[in-house]
Amino acid sequence: MQQRSRVLGGTLAGIVAAAAATVAPWPSQATPPGQKTVTATLFERKYVDVAKACTDQLGPAGYGYVEVSPASEHIQGGQWWTSYQPVSYKIAGRLGDRDAFASMVSACHAAGVKVIADAVVNHMAAGSGRHHAQYTKYNYPGFYQDQTFHGCRKSISDYTNRDDVQTCELVDLADLGTGSDYVRTTIAGYLGLRSLGVDGFRIDAAKHISATDLAAVKGKMKDPGFWVQEVIYGAGEAVRPDEYTGIGDVDEFRYGTHLKSAFQSGNIAQLKSVADGKLWQRQARTFVDNWDTERNGSTLTYKDGAAYTLANVFMLASPYGSPNVYSGYEWTDKDAAAGGSTGWTDDAAKREITGMVGFRNAVGSAELTNWWDNGGRPLAFARSDKGFVALNNGDAALTQTFATSLPAGTYCDVVHAASSCDGDTVTVGDTEAQVDAAKSVALHVGATGQSACRQAVALHVPGQSAGSPRSSAKRVEQ
């Protein structure tokens, strides 16, 4: 074991007043419903493995939701995107059958985690299904025939033309005529996965279905549950994300792009305006990356290491949007499906992330206050008197003083001690602070005490006397 100095907190607010940047607090959002608003997306995980993850990891960490990849029967192939090319609405994809899906939902519910199913309802594909039945384009026995598809039988070519985007074909896939009552009823029937206990849906490619048609589908469901829709913003495009906010939440792709710009530019101070120009906070689902963006280069990915982790810490600490933590698998071939039982990134289960899920649950709707930055790589802020976080995206340790707004007491640093406070504690009091390079510190009122902890270091609470112990804060590295 090696010992090294590491101070975790901050002190006298007046010392940093001249350098501090302030910003009006962001209001907090309230969706998805319930007190636990964080989703974990387990991309391409078999349903039996999702069930285990809910029981062993997601439930204990405090996740409110798990999002799973599409369940419907799809074309054969060794590429991940075959899951997004359905040939029927049978629960018969590579991730598990109907029984496996139902068992997963039950296990996740028992662990306190609700289930969001990724639903592909914009189009159908052609080819052999998972059970070797052959499907031809525009002919899906028991579901759809030629007349149930849009008449534009060509690929989308003009995103400034609404009709082209919503009636022509996404990568040559047969585009469902969602203006038809029959099609709407059939889609609503598939979304009857609610009968298996599913709590909500991510609507894939929602941008390519008119908001009017999607609202009509939802209106056919007695209890549609929570919806989040994939509507990617594009400058100058005809279809906008805000058209869909009356139906449900919308994935805010600009958020992940903003995070990448901030963490790679050397100026994470720009994140004080992360909500500007985006969807209203109560309607946006935020994420650092997903399976598309990690492959097209528009966001950070697991390959970015510490910056990726810090971006997730920031997302979970800040009040804008409903956060979605993505867990995929390691890849070199952008098209390749998951290889088996190894290679999963498991970001949703990492200590830094699970600790911040608890932070998010503890601070609730508390406002963002006491924003501090120096115009460069570090930042810090409080969530009223409920929580405090500091991030250092630099390559050298940061020594600084911060205003935490926390009540006096001893707190667990939850990014280093996500459970049972078995890493570091921080005592709110009076000493200077250091945050290591490429690291963060997070404290909240739901994680206090010194159970199994080795160290204490002080931070200052504005307006309180500085009488807490001083410490060199040496931490044993495990």
UniProtKB/Swiss-Prot annotation:
Matches recorded under Pfam families: Alpha-amylase, Alpha-amylase_C
Catalyzed chemical reaction(s): Endohydrolysis of (1->4)-alpha-D-glucosidic linkages in polysaccharides containing three or more (1->4)-alpha-linked D-glucose units
Binding positions (Ca(2+)): 122, 175, 208
Annotated site (Transition state stabilizer): 292
Enzyme type, top EC level: hydrolase
GO biological process: carbohydrate metabolic process
Cofactors demanded by this protein: Ca(2+)
SMART domains recorded: Aamy (SM00642), Aamy_C (SM00632)
A Gene Ontology molecular function term of the record: alpha-amylase activity
Signal peptide: 1-30
Active-site annotation: 204, 230
The keyword Metal-binding appears for this protein: yes
Keywords, sorted A to Z: Calcium, Carbohydrate metabolism, Glycosidase, Hydrolase, Metal-binding, Signal
Hydrolase in keyword set: yes
E.C. code: 3.2.1.1
Protein origin, superkingdom: Bacteria
Cofactor comment text: Binds 1 Ca(2+) ion per subunit.
Entry's family note: Belongs to the glycosyl hydrolase 13 family.
Quaternary structure annotation from Swiss-Prot or TrEMBL: Monomer.
Name by which UniProt lists this protein: Alpha-amylase
Organism of provenance: Streptomyces hygroscopicus
